[in-house]
Amino acid sequence: MKLTCVLIVIMLFLTVCPLITADHSRDKQEHPAMRLKDRIRYLRRGKLTRDCKHQNDSCAEEGEECCSDLRCMTSGAGAICVT
């Protein structure tokens, strides 16, 4: 009887544990993993580059660069990428 109760408690714990510890970011991965083979292929094609900011996008934070034909212009409200 005691063994049965212990087994039931363990089974309940094991079924509830993943629900308690689960992260609520389901299907919201920001940077999906890229296989090494794909990464090498993109590097050879020159497509593995940092994203640049387009016209009228904010460029105030460090590390954010405007695309090659744009420049970051600071105004009273912040900074945006302009031609």
From Swiss-Prot:
Range of residues in the leader sequence: 1-22
Pfam families membership: Conotoxin
Cellular component GO terms held in the UniProt record: extracellular region
Propeptide: 23-49
Tissues expressed in: Expressed by the venom duct.
A GO MF label: ion channel inhibitor activity
Keyword Methyltransferase found: no
Subcellular localization(s) per the UniProt record: Secreted
InterPro entries recorded: Conotoxin (IPR004214)
Keywords recorded for this protein, A-Z: Disulfide bond, Knottin, Neurotoxin, Secreted, Signal, Toxin
Disulphide connectivity of cysteines: 52-67, 59-72, 66-81
Highest taxon of source: Eukaryota
Domain notes for this protein: The presence of a 'disulfide through disulfide knot' structurally defines this protein as a knottin. The cysteine framework is VI/VII (C-C-CC-C-C).
Family membership noted in the UniProt record: Belongs to the conotoxin O1 superfamily.
The protein, known as: Conotoxin MiEr92
Species this protein is from: Conus miles (Soldier cone)
